[in-house]
């Protein structure tokens, strides 16, 4: 895999409750000089979701995986296995995908460091990072990981990025208003573009 690949696959919930953490992940990735990728980046009805995810995984050197939302949900109550499945795809690509995938690296988040052992014990050898549901904690962990695993000393510290993220969130309503975007209709592409514009202004 080419050294210049700075694409980061984001595997996490996309619901409203998780949105603060998702936004923190995307902001941190972009602020650190990388490109955030996820299944929301393209709306193509001719391409099924699994194929789209496989394509993105194939193209990304790095991965951010949050397995904190595997609890039962809905009626009937069933567990949510999308995130563990996509984590498995990423780890499988690294192990079996050939030479260009061997440099893949990922960080795994959960609410608590050892909670995952109760439902996905096969990854017990992995280093799980706890965010406790707090964007600030996630940003600190993610920024340090990106800096270490990319070898890029220009990636800022997580506390500094966290402060920038707070300022960005405060400015966001005015930014959306200027772009004539209702917060409820903002797509992943819109949010990416807004973050890039804010950071490069």
What are these model-predicted stretches?
Residues 69-96:
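Conserved TIR/SEFIR loop-to-helix hotspot centered on a Trp-containing motif
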